Design a protein with these regions (language model features):
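Short, flexible active-site-proximal loops enriched in glycine and acidic residues
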Residues: 53-54, 91-98
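ATP-grasp fold ATP-binding core
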Residues: 98-105
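Helix-start/capping segments and mature chain N-termini
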Residues: 1-88, 111-339
């Protein structure tokens, strides 16, 4: 009897089947390509355990419902599918790797193409799994060096035009903000978008907080995505007896702040120490941020900063000094000497 072969590449859940990552393909006629018509979530683990997975999946279901995408699957079933993908891929992960899930729900074929192309009409549920280190290892220095907050000319799309609480792939305004920051002369810059009234909203995939007089302030949530990590900051702050206030914040409030930080799933929270190159507060990582990141690390049983730094030690790319954690700008190519 021939023993079953072990997977040699990561496995993806694709519409009820487990397929090799290289074989998970969408049709060129899918609405995802036509309109960015996708509800999605991205998660991470700590010590191999998924963090707030149910909350992410509940938001995924809500986003799909708002978009009229018929995702006919319970949160419990989605959890099972996610855990199956992780179990399939764990043998290919290093012992210190964390699992970063990427869960996409596309509408499927546009009605124009239904019954005209020989493929299922959709919707499509795709669950991919890759090492967290890909996302954070080249930006680990931000935990100690801090972020330079930059407000681009691109504005946040207000809730009166597009519901921001729906997490979807149609994020061209994020892309335009990052394109602008790719020409920023400073380093470690992350974009912070303002709304049409000039109030602070969110980063391109992150929420934002400032600290003043030992109180945490964050933009009121009408015009932003209410992040899972944002909610967890509220939980930690309550346990630490730190007041959190949601209110309209202006760029002036950021310049006058004692500390600032971003929250997002892969990084948890990252300090911001400059605003357009000028120091925020003392211009270094502050005590309230330090309390929060230490508490977060204790709760999940992982030293978040040390883990990122350990990943950085294995990187072949070096520091991501560009404008976003996703290295939007291409690194400069070194000219080779001619003989």
């Amino acid at each position: 009897m021939i023993p079953p072969q072990k997977n040699t590449q990561r496995i993806v859940y694709f519409n009820g089947s487990m397929v090799p990552e290289s074989e998970a393909r969408l049709s060129i006629y899918d609405s995802a390509l036509m309109f960015g018509d996708v509800a999605f979530e991205m998660t991470r683990s700590f010590n191999k355990k998924q963090f707030k997975l149910r909350e992410h999946l509940e938001r995924l279901i809500a986003s799909a419902k708002w978009l009229h995408i018929p995702l006919e699957m319970s949160v419990q079933k989605l959890e099972v599918c996610c855990q199956q993908v992780i179990a399939e891929n764990e043998p290919l992960f290093a012992p210190d790797d964390e699992h970063r899930l990427m869960i996409n729900v596309t509408r499927g074929l546009l009605g124009l193409y239904a019954n005209r192309v020989q493929i299922p009409s959709g919707p499509n549920l795709i669950i991919a799994d890759f090492p967290l280190r890909w996302t954070i290892q080249d930006s680990a220095h931000l935990y100690t060096d801090g972020i330079d907050v930059v407000i681009p000319s691109q504005r946040m799309i207000p809730a009166s035009l597009l519901e921001p609480k729906v997490k979807n792939r149609n994020r061209i305004h994020y892309l335009m903000a990052n394109i602008e920051l790719s020409n920023y002369k400073g380093k470690n810059a992350w974009a912070l978008l303002i709304d049409p009234d000039g109030f602070l909203t969110e980063g391109t995939g992150s929420n934002f907080f400032i600290i003043k007089n030992n109180r945490i302030y964050t933009p009121e949530p009408r015009n932003l995505l209410r992040g899972i990590s944002r909610d967890y900051v509220f939980e930690l702050a309550k346990e630490l007896d730190i007041t959190v206030i949601e209110k309209n914040l202006e760029p002036y409030d950021l310049m006058a702040a004692d500390e600032a930080f971003f929250s997002c799933t892969p990084f948890s929270i990252v300090p911001a120490v400059r605003f357009h190159g000028r120091e925020i507060g003392a211009g270094k990582v502050g005590p309230i941020y330090t309390k929060l990141i230490n508490s977060w690390s204790q709760k999940v049983g992982v030293d978040i900063i040390a883990q990122a730094q350990a990943y950085a030690a294995t990187s072949t790319l070096g520091l991501a000094l560009g404008p976003t954690p996703y290295q939007f700008a291409e690194p400069e190519k070194k000219s080779s000497a001619t003989s």
